[in-house]
């Protein structure tokens, strides 16, 4: 790295240049200034000391956005995005950014880094294998390893009808006492309690959907629940064309409740006027369920991690 390159914390005046560099480096996942502010800058855990930039003769030429959960007691951290301008690559700038950030995190007791899925504001569940092969090679050179390979999927809703097997599953579940239905206001507290117990990371997403569904404008969102004898055992939500999150109480899995929820949500999304459904993250095992409803793989990611010990 040349002597004119300086690594420092993010400053307010960097916004425009950082967004421009983000879009040049992470071209498959562009953002604008509004997304930068709403997702990251205004995140309660945002710390300029974990968002480092590199400048060359005063011009921004690299960045790495790291996040920790400020109120958490664990020792985890996340790399949400990073990049170096094409004209400054292979000069050690990326390594300097990461090394500086890792050193800062070690002093805070951080001992584990995941690349990608910082909740709630992750862009992708890892590094896109097709779009960013050089980034994967760089991370491997920095000591990161691939934990698993999640995929993103998409389905057309035009002409969608639930498969006969899903209809039969819904009928069987009803006979067993499990009912799938749209959420109503009386579900707010029970659903929040269900999420707190089974899917605490998704509570914020569900709360945001319920604020619109029951408090302002329901045109962009849907929410369905699965219940047995009045007890919520599963739920599924959508916002615009994005399906999920959704989940089922672990003790109720394997009975087809997830498939039944999916078969109810997709027609509801189409009724809202949306023509496709997509989501960012699932496993190959779960993808079998989605493929039965017309979903196809559109992206494949490397979920990478690194130990700082």
Which sequence ranges carry the predicted segments?
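Short hairpin/turn module used for nucleic-acid contact or packing/dimerization
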Residues: 254, 262-263, 267-309
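Conserved hydrophobic beta-strand within the GNAT/NAT acetyltransferase core sheet
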Residues: 79, 113-115, 243, 277-281
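Active-site rim helix/loop that mediates acceptor-substrate recognition in acyltransferases
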Residues: 22, 26-57, 61-69, 197-223, ...
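A short, internal acetyl-CoA/4′-phosphopantetheine-binding micro-motif in the GNAT/acyltransferase core
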Residues: 79-89, 118-121, 246-254
